[in-house]
Amino acid sequence: MDSNTVSSFQVDCFLWHIRKRFADQELGDAPFLDRLRRDQKSLRGRGSTLGLDIETATRAGKQIVERILEEESDEALKMTIASVPASRYLTDMTLEEMSRDWFMLMPKQKMAGSLCIRMDQAIMDKNIILKANFSVIFDRLETLILLRAFTEEGAIVGEISPLPSLPGHTDEDVKNAIGVIIGGLEWNDNTVRVSETLQRFA
């Protein structure tokens, strides 16, 4: 196993632990908490794939980070922050809409890269809107957090979500996945539209 893969996982585990401590003090906003939940699933998937214990990896990650901080000057930190482009977090859905459980009468599931597409084929003759929470950088979709399909009544009838065990996807993956879910829902004579925010970037 590549040593960089292991050390990267260890550092990610420790940084997630710090962010969790921050959230436990009720200091995180909605985008922060969304990323925290998503990254927890990703770390579990990576840990399982690598065969590494998360608690042990967190301790090792702490040692790596402490060593880096000992060598870090304030001036170097300012330069690093200034050189990193900032991403924007855009939200169509509330936390309640993102976390709500939903069920399918006739489930269908497909994959587009590392994205999982799920939809209920029992839904017919409905007006449906696709809403998503995602981040944008350089005016391009960077990371899809979650996309869901809602009827006018507010029922969830479809979803696109990243697989925790396969981190990383492109904006093309997202566009392909959206095409799949639209095609699948329109097959049953549903009318599907995409939110204005999502239209601009996907």
UniProtKB/Swiss-Prot annotation:
PTM (free text): Upon interferon induction, ISGylated via host HERC5; this results in the impairment of NS1 interaction with RNA targets due to its inability to form homodimers and to interact with host EIF2AK2/PKR.
Q: Where is this motif: Nuclear export signal?
A: 137-146
Instruction: Give the principal location in a single coarse category.
Output: host cell
Question: Sorted alphabetically, which SUPFAM superfamilies does this protein's record hold?
Answer: Ns1 effector domain-like (SSF143021), S15/NS1 RNA-binding domain (SSF47060)
TM spans (from-to): none
User: Which keywords describe this protein according to UniProt?
Assistant: Eukaryotic host gene expression shutoff by virus, Host cytoplasm, Host gene expression shutoff by virus, Host mRNA suppression by virus, Host nucleus, Host-virus interaction, Inhibition of host innate immune response by virus, Inhibition of host interferon signaling pathway by virus, Inhibition of host PKR by virus, Inhibition of host pre-mRNA processing by virus, Inhibition of host RIG-I by virus, Inhibition of host RLR pathway by virus, Interferon antiviral system evasion, RNA-binding, Ubl conjugation, Viral immunoevasion
InterPro entries from the UniProt entry: NS1, NS1A, NS1A_effect_dom-like_sf, uS15_NS1_RNA-bd_sf
- Write down the Gene3D superfamilies for this protein, in alphabetical order: Influenza virus non-structural protein, effector domain, S15/NS1, RNA-binding
Record region (RNA-binding and homodimerization): 1-73
- Give the top-rank taxon of the lineage listed in the UniProt record for this protein: Viruses
Q: Which residue ranges does the UniProt annotation give for the motif Nuclear localization signal?
A: 34-38
Q: List locations, semicolon-separated.
A: Host nucleus; Host cytoplasm
GO MF term set: protein serine/threonine kinase inhibitor activity; RNA binding
What GO cellular component entries does it have?
host cell cytoplasm; host cell nucleus
Q: Which Pfam family, any one, appears in the UniProt record?
A: Flu_NS1
Which biological process, per GO, is one annotated for this protein? symbiont-mediated suppression of host mRNA processing
Q: What stretch or stretches form a coiled coil here? A: none
Q: What is known of its domains?
A: The dsRNA-binding region is required for suppression of RNA silencing.
* Protein function: Inhibits post-transcriptional processing of cellular pre-mRNA, by binding and inhibiting two cellular proteins that are required for the 3'-end processing of cellular pre-mRNAs: the 30 kDa cleavage and polyadenylation specificity factor/CPSF4 and the poly(A)-binding protein 2/PABPN1. In turn, unprocessed 3' end pre-mRNAs accumulate in the host nucleus and are no longer exported to the cytoplasm. Cellular protein synthesis is thereby shut off very early after virus infection.
Q: Which family does it belong to?
A: Belongs to the influenza A viruses NS1 family.
Oligomeric state and interaction partners are given as: Homodimer. Interacts with host TRIM25 (via coiled coil); this interaction specifically inhibits TRIM25 multimerization and TRIM25-mediated RIGI CARD ubiquitination. Interacts with human EIF2AK2/PKR, CPSF4, IVNS1ABP and PABPN1.
Q: What is this protein called?
A: Non-structural protein 1
